[in-house]
Regions:
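Short boundary/loop segments of OB/S1/cold-shock single-stranded nucleic-acid-binding domains
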Residues: 22-32
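OB-fold/S1-family single-stranded nucleic acid-binding modules
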Residues: 125-148
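OB-fold and OB-like beta-barrel modules that bind single-stranded nucleic acids
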Residues: 37-40, 112-121
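Structural detector for short beta-strands of small beta-barrel domains
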Residues: 31-63, 67-74
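Bacterial N-terminal signal peptides that target proteins for export
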Residues: 1-8
Length: 148
């Protein structure tokens, strides 16, 4: 008898936590800029043809990745699952933008450092060329605390 009310209470608590977690997820459809803080890296990932191992002949692909301080979840895209958390975001530079050269230079200088990032147009990973669960087009990047 005692076990049934306890099980019901635990299930209700878990359902409530799940609803709360979904409400707290980042919505990539929002019109506000997306902001993140974390450590910037530029690792090599295996690309075509097999996306498995550079040493076995796959083309090396480099990507700018920000490792977040804490995992997040995201919604607003068919390739994002609000029940999944992640702590990496791939940063993209729009090469047609006027400031693309400056952004690429800043990215290179800030590898290995803690950064503050502002982005737009977030979307979930869709292909083997996407190396984090969330990809964001970079608008601004600065060393953490400088606010440039």
């Amino acid at each position: 008898m005692f076990k049934m009310p306890l099980i019901v209470a635990v299930v209700c608590a878990l359902v409530g936590m799940g609803a709360h977690a979904g409400a707290a997820c980042l919505d990539v459809r929002q019109s506000q800029p997306l902001t993140f803080k974390g450590s910037l890296s530029r690792p090599v990932f295996p690309g075509p043809p097999n996306y498995e191992d550079v040493k076995k002949g796959d083309k090396p692909e480099r990507a700018y990745i920000i490792k977040l301080d804490a995992p997040i979840c995201a919604t607003g895209d068919e390739f994002l699952d609000s029940s999944q958390t992640f702590d990496t975001v791939q940063l993209l530079v729009d090469d047609s933008a006027n400031d693309s050269r400056a952004l690429n230079a800043s990215l290179t200088q800030l590898i290995g450092k803690r950064v503050e990032v502002t982005g737009k147009s977030g979307f979930g990973a869709q292909t083997g060329h996407h190396h984090a669960p969330l990809l964001v087009t970079l608008v601004k990047i600065a060393a953490e605390g400088t606010g440039r």
